[in-house]
């Protein structure tokens, strides 16, 4: 029981609200009255005063008249605030003969989106005089008619109403006829001619009368028609209609030519007096345009289109007359039935074409009116919009509807809407009209730029050109206009103390990252950048993304040979190998590194050239130089090898080193043999030199030939003189040469002199090795006294006569153990015995002696040399040298492809003296001290 009671209370509440809204609507209607036929601009009423507004505020408040496409009868005067006539107001044209004529219009207050209804009653004035359809009318009357017979007269029409309408008729005075006016049920007055006295055709065949119609206006208006009464022979029967009134209902829009009905009248007379014809009687022009009457058959057909919206009812007067002229009257009442032939009309009265996406729900977008000219259910209209749109419709006053925002708009999802408003009536079949409203959603900056990737990785090869494009970074902003204009920038970081902006830059508009300098992989391998994308909205929004820039290594570094180090003076090192070495004996090891990485740092070693092919081999990956076969007696003492070190880059880079290997089992043999070794001549260099000499000679001989011919005689004499001077002066001193160490390694340096004794007829030379002068001596004078020369000539031995100058055979200290030899052989047992020196100082002394002898044999242009940190010797000599231990190249040397470093096998030297080295312990100690 409680539920129905609660439901009834809700119903009562809604009924009260509805009745209250009706009261409000009625309270907002304004009524005016105005007479018709006023001049244009005539004041109808003070609208501003009735609205409670100042006259000048109508335009500001957006007050205007809205209509549904009909002719505007009224207008607003924005200055006075009055409602005035916009043109001629014709009551008869608007309302025909309706007793009350009103014009309805709506006033729109745009600032409040409110509709105000105004009803203007148009008061009739006497502006139309009564008129007859025909100015003349002939009535045929039988002369035998009895007094009292009535004859219908033509009716007059007056478009005015009320007092101004037709009030009565008057007939001109005569002796035979009088006027009687009858009033029908519809209030229309019908004049009739009444025969008062008998007629005599032979006395007067035609009677002329004047019928006057007048209205009740002030002043009175009237109209006249001439009535001609023609007397005929007797026709005592008039036609008679089968029905006093004919009723028919037809649907509008019947096809033209459709027969509506057939009227029928009969006349009992015979002959011409009984022949009946039909015609319309006193019809308006509009009816004559819609209907057609067949005068012989009485068929009424549709002549024009029937439109219920123009008129739903037609009253047509018809008459039938026989041959002599007797007439009968009847009515045809045509009711036009409405069909759903008019689609609803939608008139947009207020529209917002653009709206911000942040607008709140309930915001009014448009106000429109819906009208259907049909009636009944055919005129009931419902409006709808698609369900998927964020809008809704709301009905307001009368047939007005509002389009509102229902959900929050998002321009990034939909930037514009083409809203279809469908107005559908309830007819059968229903008709509909679609109206389109375009709405542009205005963007606000509510979206930050979004990068296409969560992070970026870019790669650039080193040695890139400055300004090279690295990567294009793209960020999308779904907003529009300035809100979508993205500006790119880099974070202000530093790299190795330098600002990031000195390394890379980014195009603020395109997001293309450029390199501002050439990168070096060996300097750094990667950069971490932070890219910011900022839009141009207010306030601006931004996003960041990380960028990892990796520098790719290129093969831009040539392999660097650590051992043997290439001397700066052009000499080559000397490696010592016993002639009794077995195949596979480790002679030395070429050690190289490459600053590049990866494949660019993979090194391979190859034997490029050898003075004795097949004698030595080089490890492809280790660089170890080993004997490929046993050494033979015919193998030369001095072997020259050219080893190339090549990386695996593209293109590959390489470096070469020249090794000189001295092959002997005994030190004296080395000294004796090196004296007679001539430096090999590089055939390729010789060929190049020959080509250069030939080219220079070919160019110069043309210019110098004549000079040479003139001077050849003097040159011969000068040459003879020089020979004589040389014979007289004795031995000439030659420039000193010196042994130097390279790459920061101080090797011992020995200075000596070459003296050549030449006479004009001598065929031999004497090599003299006088006592060397030391700046940093191997054995200082303070500690060891004066040393004997390594080699002396026979003449010098005779002069000095000192047996101490004779060379003693080497003792057992002059043995190299396998641990003291260059290369990785230090891993072998250091106690190996033999004829090689077994301490560092003896090795150095031996190398000095070997190199001195080799230099003399090469005529002062040695091809043997010692690189810094090697066991080799240099053939360049100077006045001073610094004595240090020859560094062991195996210490802290990186071998590509290996995790091992070369060990120092000379540790025994630091711990204790090797066996058999007693004669040299003091010297070694001196050297360490220095």
From Swiss-Prot:
Glycosylation, residue list: 418, 544
Pfam family, one: Cadherin_C_2
GO MF entry, a single one: calcium ion binding
Gene3D superfamilies the UniProt entry points to: Cadherins
Annotated stretches, region: Disordered: 803-839, 900-930
Keyword vocabulary terms for this entry: Calcium, Cell adhesion, Cell membrane, Glycoprotein, Membrane, Repeat, Signal, Transmembrane, Transmembrane helix
Signal sequence annotation: 1-27
One of the record's GO cellular component terms: plasma membrane
Cadherin domain span: 28-132, 133-241, 242-346, 347-451, 452-561, 569-682
TM regions (residue ranges): 692-712
Primary subcellular site in the record, as a coarse category: membrane
Location relative to the cell: Cell membrane
PANTHER family attached to this UniProt entry: CADHERIN-87A, PROTOCADHERIN GAMMA-A4
Protein name: Protocadherin gamma-A4
Gene: Pcdhga4
